[in-house]
Amino acid sequence: GFMIRPSTIISTVGEVMTPALLVLLLVVGITVFVSPLSDIVAPSQAYAENSALTTGLISGYQTMDVLAAIAFGGIVARALSAKNVTNPQKIVKYTISAGFVSVILLGCLYFALFYLGATSDAVAQGATNGGQIFSRYVNSLFGTAGTWIMAGIITLASLTTLVGVTSACGDYFSKFSTRFSYPFWIVFFTAMTTIISQYGLTKLLRVTIPALLLIYPMAIMLVVLQLVRNKLPFIRLSYYTTIFVTVCFSLIDSLKNLDMLPEGLHQIMTHFPLYLQGLAWLVPALCTLVLSMIFGKTISK
């Protein structure tokens, strides 16, 4: 119900759910560093076959942090407005502050998760996803109490994500139709989320990973473009060309993941840097951005 009233999002998520989640994660994180289950061992499976760094980066798509950052900025601004913070400068200030705190907290969280994964050899055998490893690790550390800690972490993490994503989607889609209001979209997306969640994490990842391989590079380049926006001599040219090239090459990465890429194109792409690591889009996208800046200066003159 509080998702339907944006003014209650900050008080519910910011003052109750997120602090409780952070406390549980802090307990787990400290315990992992104090009493790791295993020594750090060499990477295995995909992390051993390819570069551990690039494999980790692509796996990081599943966090959807960049997509969330793009969407949640509007939610923060909307929630602040509902709290009678209407001064644009203050909204920008508070949004930047919230983003800075998020970066610090996420950095600490991921560092703890990195160490957890690196020392999980004792419980990682047979696991099909990171969620299973995390659950086994916590249960091994805390015993019976670990079950309750995991239940709390999963519940709070799911609820905070649900609130943020659903509110962002509701806010976005309500702008395109007066017939379907913000509350309608909140109810609709909540119902869809409930149905889709029944398929389980492993099955969902099989569907979402190819989609993220297509979408996530665009989100990354949009953030990069926004960061250098003031340096772009011809903004429209840089945006259109960079995103177009990113889409083309990220589509190739997505089709490769699905084993649907034509063999001829695959042979050609093996000559491109980072293609075999699943990052075929990176170099072409950055090169296109640089070239668009050079041509933009020429056109401006």
Predicted regions: what is each one?
Residues 105, 159, 173-202, 209, ...:
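Loop-to-transmembrane helix boundary motifs in multi-pass membrane proteins
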Residues 29-38, 46-113, 149-158, 244-254, ...:
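Hydrophobic, membrane-embedded alpha-helices of multi-pass small-molecule transporters
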Residues 35, 235-236, 241-301:
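A generic transmembrane alpha-helix motif of multi-pass inner-membrane proteins
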Residues 3-32, 209-220, 239-246:
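Membrane-interface loop-to-helix entry segments
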Residues 147-177:
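Membrane-helix boundary/coupling elements in multi-pass transport proteins
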Residues 104-133:
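Extracellular/periplasmic helix-exit of transmembrane alpha-helices
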Residues 93, 134-148, 175-182:
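Transmembrane-helix boundary/entry motifs in multi-pass membrane transporters
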Residues 1-17, 82-85, 195-206, 223-233:
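Membrane-water interface regions at transmembrane-helix termini and the short interhelical loops
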